Amino acid sequence: MKKKIKLVASDIDGTIIDRSNNISPKNFEAIKKIQNKKIPFAVCTGKSYSVSKGICEQFNANYGIFGNGTQIVDLKTGKELHRDILTQEDLLFVATMAKRFHYHIHIYTDTTIITERLKYMDLRNFKLKKKNGVKSLKFRIVLNIVDYIEKHKPEVFSAVITTEDTTLQEFKNLLNINDRMECTYINKRGQYRDQVINKDYEYLNITPTNIDKDQALEFLSKYLKVPRSQILAIGDNVNDLNMVKNSGVGVAVNDAYDDIKKVATYVTETKVSDGAFAEAINKYI
């Protein structure tokens, strides 16, 4: 007997969309199945709302958790339910340290990716914007990001520090002296290689402290009056770990990071490109 699911929450990249930015037709059918059963569907991503708006519309999702939990939006009304931003002090600290250690940094506001040059994830987002015709997302190239922050004081949900070196774990420890920030390390090498720009790298995603997809899903759970025991959460990456672990049914796709598989209720037999998301939906709904 299938468990009664009243909310489906899923990561996007690496879970519904594969690493080459393709979507299995099976996954589209699974999304239609959720909608036909009148079950709310929440997309949960590390990207900002402006980056993700097009795909949210394509999926006809009900709710969006963006920036790894820094922003929650009712996608049917456009109402922002919750937001957290980095303080100017913390943002300047991160940007200054990144430049001191010669790391690439870009930052996310409501509508814009701000960077000194397009490289790594911001280059990926730029290519996908051009490919998919995303009008909601803007890019601003600045001469010096620290100077820009000091002058314009942008409201920033998250900062991303990237390198092709293998030194970010040590840098993360340095940033962790600031207990007002949350730093998530993600490895995009080998089997996790970024296929859109065909490059290996690693990055830190930096948000206000105690903010992640799981905390945002907890907020949404209370907002919708749906107990966590009746939520199906699906993911592949380390920023999905807690929401997969703490939901009634937590699913890791076949090509997920091993840490996610260890806490999941179920690991799909199929890979993302073959419809892993659809397998999870058909098994539990």
Spans of model-derived segments:
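Conserved acidic, metal-coordinating active-site core of Asp-based
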Residues: 112-232
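Short active-site oxyanion
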Residues: 38-42, 61-62, 157-159, 229-230, ...
